[in-house]
């Protein structure tokens, strides 16, 4: 009888040990899955927003944005840089500089200061009218084509076809303008 009781106790202990081991493995796997989900919720959760000046809602997360958001931001940056007069150029360029990374602001300040000086000296007014917009959200790239009308003093407007490429990055909930460049268009 001692022999049978001892085997029965060993079996119960073995089954209990296996059961506890299975519970520990399940608990660890659930904790890992929960940790991954928490990370994704914290960094990849998208918020849908509809701004005042635009009709199309957009979605943003901590480190990414959809095509609609990138398009609207790029059009806002274009307006801040190109829809200016001698009275508004300083305020517009100052607002644009807030979206440039702090390390690149000095270079952009020089470019914008030269533009502002020419605009003020020649009493220039300009307006940009977009004709097409293409967005690549995975790269943060926005290409905008349009017509730039420029008035110098009281003259008739000069019309130029322009093609701009803007690179936008979204990091830690902040949108940065990495590049604001003009490219030559072969279709002129």
Curated annotation (Swiss-Prot):
Q: Keyword set for this entry?
A: Conjugation, Plasmid
Do you know which Pfam families this protein is assigned to? TraE
Q: Which InterPro entries match?
A: Pilus_assembly_TraE
Q: What does this protein do?
A: Involved in F pilus assembly.
Which family does the similarity line name?
A: Belongs to the TraE family.
Protein name stated in the entry: Protein TraE
